[in-house]
A protein has these predicted regions:
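Conserved catalytic-core segment of NTP-binding enzymes
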Residues: 1-118
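C-terminal lobe/tail of nucleotide-utilizing enzymes
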Residues: 64-211
Length: 211
């Protein structure tokens, strides 16, 4: 508030060390990014055990110390949902091999992570998440707690990294300057525009859920 900053984003590494514990449990909200593979499916189970463990540890610490201090860890981050990403699309949908893992991860979130987070009140209610999704999407392919589906960036990521520019902000000229022309140029422009809409929708959902 002092510096007119509304949101601070932390990009945490995929581990369950002490630093991640403190950062996550002192946050107001959190989102879990996942890729469609066995390791992310397994990680959902790990989060389902470790977040409640962290919550218990910090609750005990606050009880035995000055837990009412304005600088103490809140210990109640609210789960907004997950972002399914880094999959290969075909005709606008994930190919079957990726869809299998996306469905398995979605099931693990619904059946394992969500119930465990509900026990410690570290989650936004499902109906509120679904309302935010319905309000900010017209495709109908998302449901709580799926906040967004972001496919692989393919060649756009190389241009993005070279220019230090977000994928959705790459200009037509910058794509041409990378050596693209004809059908490839048009395909990359269409992909860039699609990513722009996806990220706009995700931002709107986050704003809706955290306002």
């Amino acid at each position: 508030m002092k510096n007119n900053i509304d949101y601070i984003l932390y990009d945490l590494s995929p581990n369950v060390g002490g630093l991640n514990e403190v950062v996550l449990m002192s946050s107001d909200y959190f989102i879990v990014p996942v890729a469609p593979d066995f390791f992310c499916w397994q990680a959902i189970r790990s989060l389902s055990k470790n977040i409640p463990r962290w919550h218990k540890e910090l609750a005990l610490f606050k009880e035995n110390n000055d837990g009412n201090s304005s600088q103490s860890i809140k210990n109640a981050p609210q789960f907004l949902g997950m972002i399914q990403q880094r999959y290969r699309p075909r005709k606008g949908a994930p190919v079957k091999s990726f869809e299998k893992w996306m469905a398995a991860i979605r099931d693990a979130v619904d059946s394992i992570l969500v119930p465990n987070l509900e026990k410690i009140t570290c989650i936004i209610p499902r109906d509120k998440v679904q309302h935010a999704i319905n309000k900010t999407t017209v495709s109908g392919d998302l449901s709580a707690y799926d906040l967004a589906h972001i496919s692989d960036f393919n060649s756009l990521i190389a241009i993005s990294q070279q220019l230090a520019t977000p994928v959705f902000s790459i200009s037509d000229q910058q794509i041409r300057d990378s050596g693209q022309f004809g059908h490839a140029l048009n395909t990359m422009k269409s992909s860039r525009d699609a990513f722009n809409e996806q990220f706009k929708g995700l931002a709107q959902r986050v704003l809706e859920l955290t306002k």
